């Protein structure tokens, strides 16, 4: 496959106004995508965005480019990424476009595409779009220009879809839940979903102003929701990221429940109901505790590369249904085509109701092993991971850890960093092992 120039593993992303994320590129990208997508004969594309102030600019540019290529555009306004995937399917659109940089700060933004079935756009189509980007923009004839309309009931449609994933004979009455929307795309969705299911909801991170998305709130900044759960005496907390495709949770003790623990809950619940197909897909960063806990239940576990795109690829290859990342991207292919933080939260709450159990009780059998991650910066073309010294240090640590530990060394995909991850039974021992390997990497750099 040819090397992609613009598209990364999750679309195009960067700092607004520099590099790739300019209105000029967005205009041309809309046109190029329109040229490729119109070949199928369908001429309808949906656009959604998160709450970044730059979203207005990129929405207008994409809209103009798609229209210039002859495609009709349907605007959703601020809506979660999984809502775009869902409504792309239900409106029988040729594609969905999301303007978001997910959990990044407000000054970043990104553009990613979904195919007509609500899954990430095929690599080959992205390459075709990149090829069109190299050509001069040519507008279709005036009578063929695309029209633009707005989906006025997008919010209500998606709320009903989310609620449909909760058992019809159950309610959340009696539960007090803190919901953190990260000042992002779920601010007008998530609190309503859980309230309509019967819960008492305390919403935080629900007042976006264009520049506060993910700012000390949301799934990547858990301190505020942990504190709020404790001060409000809530039963649990649900934290979403800026575009709503990621979830972290908090139990009544103010302890964070991460993506690995959520996967464990969902797998146990599916097995108990006899609907678990195959096993669970995690990533190279998934805690060894998840692997061991699933082994104890005879549930197969497989690891993909880091990234929800790779989790999805392995799920499809194995024909399994449940997978995700410890960072909170949760995939359940019986309930959607992409990571959906709200739906994942609903599925956990459904498991709690079915088993009449708390979050603490559902996660108790899974022992999270201490995990230490050390980032080591390197310069030049030399690969420190090929060093005999680094290999020797890794072998020494793996020998000492045995079956109750794990070492992972990998290069960052975005920075000149080697990530050293070590897991084991004792935090201090794991920290010492990680520093030993990190020192070897530094000396080899």
Curated annotation (Swiss-Prot):
It comes from the Bacteria. PROSITE patterns: PGM_PMM. Coiled coil: none annotated. It is an enzyme of class 5 (isomerase). GO terms for biological process: carbohydrate metabolic process; peptidoglycan biosynthetic process; UDP-N-acetylglucosamine biosynthetic process. Its cofactor is Mg(2+). Pfam families: PGM_PMM_I, PGM_PMM_II, PGM_PMM_III, PGM_PMM_IV. Binds 1 Mg(2+) ion per subunit. One of its GO terms (cellular component) is cytosol. Mg(2+) binds at residues 102, 241, 243, 245. Keywords: Isomerase, Magnesium, Metal-binding, Phosphoprotein. The keyword Magnesium applies. GO terms for molecular function: magnesium ion binding; phosphoglucosamine mutase activity; phosphomannomutase activity. InterPro entries: A-D-PHexomutase_a/b/a-I (IPR005844), A-D-PHexomutase_a/b/a-I/II/III (IPR016055), A-D-PHexomutase_a/b/a-II (IPR005845), A-D-PHexomutase_a/b/a-III (IPR005846), A-D-PHexomutase_C (IPR005843), A-D-PHexomutase_C_sf (IPR036900), A-D-PHexomutase_CS (IPR016066), Alpha-D-phosphohexomutase_SF (IPR005841). It catalyses: alpha-D-glucosamine 1-phosphate = D-glucosamine 6-phosphate. Activated by phosphorylation. Its EC number is 5.4.2.10. The modification Phosphoserine is found at residue 102. The active site is at 102 (phosphoserine intermediate). Catalyzes the conversion of glucosamine-6-phosphate to glucosamine-1-phosphate. Belongs to the phosphohexose mutase family. This is Phosphoglucosamine mutase 1. It comes from Shewanella sp. (strain MR-7).
């Amino acid at each position: 496959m040819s090397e992609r120039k613009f598209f990364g593993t999750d679309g195009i992303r960067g700092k607004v106004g520099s590099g790739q994320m300019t209105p000029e590129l967005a205009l041309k990208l809309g046109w190029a995508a329109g040229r490729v997508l119109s070949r199928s004969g369908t001429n309808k594309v949906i656009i959604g965005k998160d709450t970044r102030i730059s979203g207005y600019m990129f929405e207008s540019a994409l809209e103009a480019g798609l229209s210039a290529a002859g495609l009709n555009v349907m605007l959703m306004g601020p809506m979660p990424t999984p809502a775009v995937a869902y409504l792309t399917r239900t409106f029988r659109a040729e594609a969905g476009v999301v303007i978001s940089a997910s959990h990044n700060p407000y000054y970043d933004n990104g553009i990613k595409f979904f195919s007509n079935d609500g899954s990430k756009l095929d690599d080959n189509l992205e390459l075709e779009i990149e090829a069109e980007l190299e050509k001069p923009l040519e507008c279709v004839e005036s009578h063929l220009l695309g029209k633009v309309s707005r989906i006025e009931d997008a919010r209500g449609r998606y709320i009903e879809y989310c609620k449909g994933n909760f058992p019809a004979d159950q309610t959340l009455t009696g539960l007090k839940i803190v919901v953190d929307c990260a000042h992002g795309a779920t601010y007008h969705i998530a609190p309503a979903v859980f309230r309509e299911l019967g819960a008492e909801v305390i919403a935080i991170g629900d007042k976006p102003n264009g520049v506060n998305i993910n700012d000390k709130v949301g799934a990547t900044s858990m301190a505020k929701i942990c504190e709020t759960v404790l001060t409000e005496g809530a039963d649990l907390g649900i934290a979403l990221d800026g575009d709503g495709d990621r979830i972290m949770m908090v139990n009544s003790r103010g302890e964070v429940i991460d993506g690995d623990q959520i996967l464990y809950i969902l797998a146990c619940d599916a097995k108990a109901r006899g609907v678990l197909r195959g096993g669970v897909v995690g990533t190279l960063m998934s805690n060894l505790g998840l692997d061991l806990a699933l082994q104890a239940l005879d549930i197969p576990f497989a690891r993909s590369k880091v990234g929800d795109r790779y989790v999805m690829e392995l799920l499809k290859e194995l024909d399994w249904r449940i997978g995700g990342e410890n960072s909170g991207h949760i995939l359940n292919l019986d309930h959607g085509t992409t990571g959906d933080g709200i739906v994942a939260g609903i599925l956990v709450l459904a498991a709690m109701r079915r088993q009449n159990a708390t979050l603490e009780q559902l996660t108790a059998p899974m022992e999270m092993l201490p995990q230490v991650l050390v980032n080591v910066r390197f310069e030049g073309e030399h690969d420190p991971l090929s060093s005999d010294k680094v290999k020797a240090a890794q072998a020494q640590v793996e020998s000492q850890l045995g079956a109750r530990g794990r070492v992972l060394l990998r290069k960052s995909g975005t920075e000149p960093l080697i990530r050293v991850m070590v897991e084991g039974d004792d935090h201090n021992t794991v920290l010492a092992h990680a520093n030993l390997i990190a020192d070897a990497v530094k000396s080899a750099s």
